Amino acid sequence: MPLVAHTDLPTFQRLREEGEEILDPDRASNQDIREMHIGLLNMMPDAALEATERQFFRLVGACNQIVQFHVHPFTIEGLKRSPEAQAHIAKYYESFEQIKRDGLDALIISGANVSHPRLPEEDFWQPLSEVFFWAKENVTSILCSCLATHALIQYCYGIERTRLPAKRWGVFSHKLTDRTHPLVAEINTRFDVPHSRFNEIFQSDMERHGLKVLAVSKEAGVHLAVSPDGFRIVFFQGHPEYDDISLLKEYKREILRFYRAERDDYPPFPENYFNDVVQQILVDYEQRVRSAKQSGQRLEEFPESLILEHIDNTWSDTAKAVFNNWLGKIYQLTHQERGLPFMDGVDPNNPLGL
């Protein structure tokens, strides 16, 4: 399902340069196939704003190569933005009002940074709730990533997330708990997913409220679950959209925070991510960081060039398969008219007929 470059968003050109298939509007208009319209509510902070676009666009673009995808990025109020990020949003993003007017077949909601212990205290909570309220009635299926999962579960079912003793950070093995669900058809029964979060919603809480858990890790808990109807909301607690080096960038950021005295302890390694060679490189670098901090010297450059060849990606293929299943089912269920969520005869309370 190739992406259509229906705007001048720089992400399209960046993906072209990486080898992704991107259709121009003229070519797309000559294909007599009902396109799909997918919203991306991007709530990530400025440093990750465009990377998040690319990550989710890649997963969408890697799906079935027949249907065309129009991805519509938008954001909400209540998120702190630099002038540069705000300019990017103003130039390339659509407004929520426009999204509502035109309609969507599917909606992806990213994670976000928080500054309060409870989600309803965040400035973005009310605008996000308005998106939830509209999408639940007007979109065939919503896919939530990490914090968006926690927010929508609290909004819909009243379940508050629990603060973990330590950050769940790294790459963890998961196992399917229901191999028959169409969302996980023909994917690996065991697969890895990156996690990066301080909070969790537990399997027991999800199942108590009727959510169907599809993939679990002994170490990291639930990654994949769906709403009681089986499809209308898909919940990720992990980050299957992450690039190879997303966790590396987070680790580098935490080292800088330590050097600047923004955190007291030196950051631990993300679990199951760095091999022995990388760990030794980073142990040596830690000594230089500590020395520079103590003496007030300038910090040496992070040894990224020595590390990149040792970083393995063990999650993207499964992520692409899940996205392919998700969007394929949406295509089968959604109405021919863009503003309506289901074709005639589909039960919204059991769209998959399970």
Curated annotation (Swiss-Prot):
InterPro entries: Class_I_gatase-like, MetA_family. It catalyses: L-homoserine + succinyl-CoA = O-succinyl-L-homoserine + CoA. GO terms for cellular component: cytoplasm. Gene3D superfamilies: 3.40.50.880. The record marks 196 as: Important for substrate specificity. Belongs to the MetA family. One of its GO terms (molecular function) is homoserine O-acetyltransferase activity. Its EC number is 2.3.1.46. Transfers a succinyl group from succinyl-CoA to L-homoserine, forming succinyl-L-homoserine. The lineage of its organism: Bacteria, Pseudomonadati, Pseudomonadota, Gammaproteobacteria, Methylococcales. This is Homoserine O-succinyltransferase. Substrate binds at residues 167, 196, 253.
